[in-house]
Swiss-Prot record:
Family matches, as HAMAP family: CytC_CcsA
Localization of this protein: Plastid, Chloroplast thylakoid membrane
Gene: ccsA
Keywords for this protein: Chloroplast, Cytochrome c-type biogenesis, Membrane, Plastid, Thylakoid, Transmembrane, Transmembrane helix
Name this protein carries in UniProt: Cytochrome c biogenesis protein CcsA
Disulfide bonds: none
GO molecular function: heme binding
Protein family membership: Belongs to the CcmF/CycK/Ccl1/NrfE/CcsA family.
One GO CC term, this protein: plastid
Binding partners and assembly: May interact with Ccs1.
Domain of life: Eukaryota
Amino acid sequence: MLFATLEHILTHISFSTISIVITIHLITLLVRELGGLRDSSEKGMIATFFCITGFLVSRWASSGHFPLSNLYESLIFLSWALYILHMIPKIQNSKNDLSTITTPSTILTQGFATSGLLTEMHQSTILVPALQSQWLMMHVSMMLLSYATLLCGSLLSAALLMIRFRKNLDFFSKKKKNVLSKTFFFNEIEYFYAKRSALKSTFFPLFPNYYKYQLIERLDSWSYRVISLGFTLLTIGILCGAVWANEAWGSYWNWDPKETWAFITWTIFAIYLHSRTNPNWKGTKSAFVASIGFLIIWICYFGINLLGIGLHSYGSFTLPI
């Protein structure tokens, strides 16, 4: 009872905090002069990270196993993984382009996890025999870390495509006030302020769309780095799962729906990474491939759980009618 109460408090504190953080993040993007609020949002992200970490530790202590046995626990772990990704640029002291992706992704993931749809999964239960293995932590954690990483990389690629194919906007015309009313896309707002700041601090001639090009290049670089990491984690997760499957079911690969879609996901991002070796495919063309991968990941992770079919149907749920 004590652990259940603690988990309830921590999840609601973390969700409330991340809701405030994303509001502050949006305000600082729209009103650049309120730069002091950005530090508050980062502190809020850190506080939320510790709340989610506390939840996972509490859940682990109360259930006696690592909390990855159902969709609710996996969503909480997925949001925790997104916090980790959010912190990486801060550790490297580089521009945090990931925050535009990780912050909204976290609130959506955590919001669904704490919604009424998964209420029956909020209470920890005893693991079914097939899941009582040391491979549970290794396999599932690697898969979820790869999902979080690949989702962020795919969204960065999608952001690249949105910026690349939007009509050029004249940010310095008299219609400047209408720009923000036409779009709420964070990266374009960032682009506007980057361009305005650069005009104040540089004296060299600017060719058309130079700062738009810079933003696209930065997004492309981040997307490639994040997807490369996610692909590595996905490969490790699939290999661990194959070893575990052999121990549990006597076969390394069964072409279960989850396994099939994991293989499709791996193939899509392998194609993406291979396309990057061709200079003509860097940027827009490879970003298309990564954007397709975004949909494939959700089918693999969420769609199979929703259907509740196959050998990986543990912890699935059905929509209320």
